[in-house]
């Protein structure tokens, strides 16, 4: 599939995603994960934060979200997002020792809809309450920000956790992600879990496989065909050929049903058939009893430009709590 064909598919997916907003059930919750690319990166280029920040906020509003996690949010970006998205509450300390410096992985939630019963940030380490602590060979300090939310209309509760796991140590990714899941079980006291993030791994690697034993990848739980691209990280550029998520899920035809059970089951000679489709490292996981109505990788470019609001695409899911 050539670039122009892929772009057609990506754009064609957008009306499907947003038209559904008007007809989705009243108790449905739209969640997302979005790595927004840290502000010090790409200075003096068309992808600088100052050049793209307004388009990023516009895309967040267009997605019509109820709760979402972001990654690589620096202090200046956090200030801007708080100011420009006043309808959302922002929860998440930065990962520096003072809790105010370096990147954050915050959770946003719509204030008119939810009440936060519990919230916080902890570090992905053997001493999670110690700011800037590191374990398991991690290259950077890493955090999880979380909430226990109650829907004001239905009274239903759920945990929302968001993180950006290490890009070097696979052990740190696995240990950190399992720490998050166990803590959400504890904090939520049995409430369903939504777990988002840039996990810096493919779904066939140990960290994702470990989490998949407890939670479910929302992509494979979707009751409708996913829309948008397979890859979520594009690094500001595309390859000559791209594949949509729907096409990827048909390769081979049995892969979708198989992966609902065990992603490792489809490996051939140690390789997963999806590996050729590019890096899909941004995730939404949900508890097994959470329904997923739809799932999308949102490929919107900045208006009038062949540029994007971030070097990652956001991923979204519309869910219904049990």
Where are the regions a protein language model picked out?
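N-terminal, active-site-proximal structural segment of metallo-dependent hydrolase catalytic domains
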Residues: 8, 18-84, 97-102, 178, ...
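Active-site metal-binding loops of divalent metal-dependent hydrolases
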Residues: 36, 163-165, 198-199, 313
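Surface-exposed cleft-lining segments at the edges of enzyme active sites
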Residues: 40-45, 128-136, 163-170
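Structured beta-strand-rich core segments of catalytic domains in phosphoester-bond hydrolases
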Residues: 67-157, 161
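Active-site neighborhood of phospho(di)ester-bond hydrolases with catalytic His/Asp-centered motifs
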Residues: 69-71, 93, 194-198, 218-220
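Metal-dependent phosphoester-hydrolase catalytic domains
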Residues: 171, 184-193, 201-322
């Amino acid at each position: 599939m050539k670039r122009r064909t892929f772009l057609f598919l990506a754009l064609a997916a957008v009306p499907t995603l947003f038209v559904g907003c008007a007809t989705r059930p009243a108790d449905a919750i739209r969640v997302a994960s979005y790595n927004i690319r840290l502000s010090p990166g790409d200075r003096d280029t068309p992808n600088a934060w100052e050049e793209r920040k307004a388009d990023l906020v516009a895309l967040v509003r267009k997605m019509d979200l109820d709760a979402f996690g972001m990654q690589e949010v620096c202090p200046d970006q956090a200030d801007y997002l708080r100011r420009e998205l006043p309808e959302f509450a922002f929860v998440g300390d930065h990962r520096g020792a003072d809790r105010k410096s370096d990147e954050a992985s915050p959770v946003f939630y719509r204030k008119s809809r939810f009440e936060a019963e519990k919230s916080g940030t902890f570090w992905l380490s053997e001493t999670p309450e110690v700011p800037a602590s590191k374990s398991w060979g991690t290259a950077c300090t890493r955090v999880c920000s979380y909430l226990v939310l109650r829907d004001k209309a239905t009274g239903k509760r759920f945990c929302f956790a968001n993180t950006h796991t290490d890009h070097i140590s696979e052990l740190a990714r696995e240990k950190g992600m399992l720490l998050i899941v166990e803590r959400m079980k504890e904090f939520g006291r049995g409430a369903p879990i939504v777990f988002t993030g840039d996990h810096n791994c493919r779904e066939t690697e140990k960290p994702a496989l470990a989490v998949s034993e407890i939670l479910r990848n929302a992509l494979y739980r979707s009751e409708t065909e996913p829309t948008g691209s397979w890859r979520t990280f594009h690094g500001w550029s595309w390859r000559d050929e791209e594949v949509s998520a729907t096409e990827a899920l048909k390769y081979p035809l049995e892969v979708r049903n198989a992966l609902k059970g065990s992603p490792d089951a489809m490996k051939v000679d140690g390789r997963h058939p999806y590996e050729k489709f590019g890096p899909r490292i941004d995730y939404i996981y949900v508890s097994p009893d959470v329904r997923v109505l739809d799932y999308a990788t949102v490929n919107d470019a900045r208006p009038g430009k062949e540029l994007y609001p971030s070097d990652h695409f956001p991923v979204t899911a519309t869910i219904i709590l049990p």
